[in-house]
Amino acid sequence: MYVYLKRELQAFTKEKYEKAFSSYFFTDSTEEFLLDFAFWLKERGIRNGNKAGLTHKLRLLRAVCRQAEKKEMYGVNMDNFLCLGDDINWPETTSRAVPETVIAKIANVDRTLFTKKEQLHLDLFLFSYYTGGMANVDVCNLTWDLVQEDRIVYERIKFPKTAKPELLSKAKAIMNKYRGQSYGNYVFPVFTHKHTTTSKKTTRVKQISTRLSQTLTKACKMLRIKENITWYSARGSFISKMVDAGNNPYVVAEMAGNSPLTIYKHYYKNTKREEIKRQMEEMF
């Protein structure tokens, strides 16, 4: 992700200022520079009919500067990012969490009705759910050296956060199922010798994520599940289940690689409304 950001900044400084990005220092990350970069991304997004990953790239740049500030590198001024306003903030999102009963149905679906690749998709989704809602890109890039005896410790690719999910027996079983079938030191057979660059790996993750969602749609139709489930649902579902079970939000956040505020704002969803209503009827 950071290599991709570097390429973006190289293209930006060359096009906007006719200068090489290698000639820039942290002192050059002024408000004017940041606003110009944001505007450049917006213009390109308009031309391409998308948002050009505006918020994600601005947040990546801020994360780089924050790490530099922690290391006391000269010229970093985090206050400059305030000029970006809402451009650097994620829009309000709706949690895609589903009840644990829905996840259980998917876990117990008749696998003989799915192809070998579709079974991999189901396993990747369930593994994500069992490991703190691990993001698709992190599941695909997971390597065996990050797996400890009782937990997984990894740096999230999209955000500069460390996640430490407990390693459940169900997650272990899924990993061991694919042991020896993957390229290099990867846990799952997602990448091959052809995926030699960050760009190729990113494309591969997008491709398998789309196909995984299609497999989940197929499973939902077979199981008569009404919810629209995607890979993203695993994260919210794990967090909601753990919080509803009374676990400390800080512990849950550490497993997911988020802050307690973030898990409540973006991922938690009350999936037990009927149960709570029954309890309230008894209480009142």
Indicate where each model-derived feature is located.
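Conserved tyrosine-mediated DNA breakage-rejoining catalytic core shared by Y-recombinases
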Residues: 83, 131, 140-177, 193
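Active-site/catalytic core of tyrosine-dependent DNA strand-transfer enzymes
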Residues: 103, 168-226
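N-terminal core-binding DNA-recognition domain of tyrosine recombinases/integrases
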Residues: 6-93, 109-113
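DNA breakage-rejoining catalytic core of tyrosine-based enzymes
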Residues: 27, 76, 89-108, 160-168, ...
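Catalytic-site neighborhood detector that most strongly recognizes the C-terminal catalytic loop/helix
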Residues: 97, 156-160, 256-281
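Short, basic (Lys/Arg/His-rich) helix/loop patches that form interaction surfaces
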Residues: 114-116, 181-183, 213-254
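Basic, Lys/Arg- and aromatic-enriched nucleic-acid-binding interface segment
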Residues: 55, 78-136, 140
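Short, polar N-cap/turn motifs at the start of nucleic acid-interacting alpha helices
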Residues: 145-153, 226-227, 247-266
